[in-house]
């Protein structure tokens, strides 16, 4: 992560919402929360509703795709019910996806995002060993496959969001409190970011 901050583009003045879904909707749409209306955490797949309307909001992914970029999302979504709206990610501008769709009402297996994580890859749903590993492998592969054309990879990572627990690095001696678990999540997230940077380097980008 430190290397990414050093070599990448860093915004030193920025505003964010202090909670997850409003922040991601703001990032996707470029609008303040009081304009787009997402002012609280809202898990659409679990609680119902229409989710983020592509007929109302334009995401940055749609903008860059219209300019000829190949686009993908790797990470979490939660802001549409992808079981009821299976084309939502495409409508929002993503050609490819590998996401945890969010916990879906009536489908308890979808609540898991880490160990035995429930992941959706280009429409295919499956339970995987560890969700962040599957998503990161998809992200690295996307970079390799599209190194010779303009591309956008949007990566709203699962880590370091709760629920807190172990990672593959410390599962044999799992943390006993939130602070230790969070530290383990940060360490594992740093490892995944390193893998992605390596993929970018190996692609010659």
Task: Tell me what each language-model feature is.
Residues 1-205:
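Formylglycine-dependent sulfatase
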């Amino acid at each position: 992560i430190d290397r990414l901050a050093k070599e990448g583009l860093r915004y030193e003045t920025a505003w964010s919402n202090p909670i997850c879904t409003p922040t991601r909707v703001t990032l996707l749409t470029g609008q303040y929360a009081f304009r787009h209306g997402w002012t609280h955490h809202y898990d659409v797949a679990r609680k119902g509703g229409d989710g983020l309307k592509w007929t109302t909001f334009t995401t940055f992914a749609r903008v860059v795709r219209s300019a000829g970029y190949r686009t993908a999302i790797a990470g979490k979504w939660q802001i549409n019910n992808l079981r009821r709206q299976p084309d939502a990610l495409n409508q929002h501008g993503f050609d490819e996806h590998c996401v945890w769709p969010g916990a879906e009402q009536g489908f308890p297996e979808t609540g898991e995002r880490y160990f035995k994580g429930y992941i959706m890859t280009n429409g295919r749903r499956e339970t995987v060993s560890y969700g962040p590993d599957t998503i990161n492998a998809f992200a690295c592969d996307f970079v390799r496959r599209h190194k010779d054309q303009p591309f956008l990879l949007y990566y709203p990572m699962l880590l370091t969001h709760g629920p807190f627990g172990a990672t593959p690095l410390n599962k044999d001696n799992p943390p006993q409190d939130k602070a230790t678990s969070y530290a383990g999540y940060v360490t594992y997230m740093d490892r995944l970011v390193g893998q992605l940077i390596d993929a970018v380097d190996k692609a010659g980008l």
